[in-house]
Amino acid sequence: PLPPVVKPAFVDTCRAGMTCIEDYGDSTRCGMASFYEALDRTSSSNPEDDGLVRIAVFGDSFIEADIFTADLREMLQKRFGGCGVGFVTITSMTSGYRPTVRHTFGGWSSHAVTDSVYFDKKKQGISGHYFIPREGAYVELRGQSKYASLLDTCQRASIFFYNKDSVYLTARVNRGENKNYSLAPSGDLQKISVEGRIGSVRWTVDRADSTLFYGLAMDGKKGIILDN
């Protein structure tokens, strides 16, 4: 008689032509348990849950200019909610051909971990950059609807910096009226945010002595944020 048929321990449920996200955790699946629980909470009606999951994607040139992450972000935001392109550095070499956000800037001294000289690693942020403004420096992000979905507007726009002295900034949302902000010196990472239905936001540095800037964000208040 023929030997009994042995069922495979794992059956790949990915249909032809699809690449699934693979969990490389151990067999107990404990490594990603908290992440899966956070995804479940995106649909929670509990007011104590903010229902927000932030995912940071680190990679090589395959994620440059959102090549891979644009599709991943769109898929996750359609499934779990959310909007906006997430974190963007103050300046970027790929701003001219990144299709997921319109990014313009001027008046900045940019420093990256890949620089051969004049880079102080003690000053770098999570992206491996820091940016020093000249007077009148500005940076603007504008959503777009021609590439991927849920990127034309966001609900919260933020700018991140570290200031040893007072800092004075101006925010202009949807090319409307300017709103002025001033923050006292701090030893911690600082953030200023504006909220609403935001299609564009422009930040201008009015004065920022001894201040390092790191990046911006266009986020939703619930669902998925995926940073490239």
For each feature predicted by the language model, list its residue ranges.
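N-terminal secretory targeting modules
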Residues: 1-58, 62-228
